[in-house]
Amino acid sequence: MSMKPCPETFPYPLIALDETDSTNRYISQLCNELQESVAELTTVTAEFQTAGKGQRGNTWEAERGKNLLFSFVLHPTFLEARRQFILSQIVSLSIKEELDRWSDEITIKWPNDIYWRDKKICGILIENDLSGHFIGRSISGIGININQNEFHSDAPNPVSLKQITGQEHDRYEILSHILKRVQIYYNGLQTEDSGTYTAEITARYARSLFRRRGFHPYEDAGGKFSARLLRVEQDGRFVLEDENGKEREYLFKEVQYII
């Protein structure tokens, strides 16, 4: 697999590939081979992925050379395993806040898809390796639709930044901005001593959620229902209130939005 040209001034360790099966798999293998010598925020990008995956095992459609397909690694050994959802929050917030530069209609669909209106612009898959009661390694795999004009898969609701704005965008510039935002959030987590920074992240995440107001349709193992969002717990549990006033609490993959 060949390397793609990338800016000489890119501010983070970067491996730019033309094609790979999965950037998550690539960087995971790299970490296994090199262990601690893989620096924080080392990033692998690809112009095309042959087996990119999403949260539910879905493939991610991305036209070659048009989008951002990348994975980066963190070593959050200071974070207890029970707090791992905070990593999902800072990654999704970093992407959402970068895309906010072009639209005020960007939201986070729990747990960490990024939406513009009712359309998906970004998918995120985070894989954490635990070391005892702490997180030894966290790899975030991300696909963002940037400059793609048309989508041909059976994905129901994709959209790209170009479709939103009508113009082409510099993918490396967007990537560097996202990583900088992640770094700022991550450094804040490393240095906090009272939990106030975590609380601020949780509050920002709550304000950014898709369909955070009003009643909307959902589906769980028992069927379809209408509910409103109450809160997302710090461990990532999704809490809804249905039309009968009953609270319903869900872990990942236990409930789906009906779009």
Predicted features by range, described:
Residues 1-101, 122:
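N-terminal lobe of the biotin/lipoate ligase/transferase fold
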Residues 9-10, 25, 77-106, 116-259:
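Long, positively charged amphipathic alpha-helical accessory segments at protein N-termini or as interdomain linkers
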Residues 18, 108-110:
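Short loop/edge segments at beta-strand edges and connector loops
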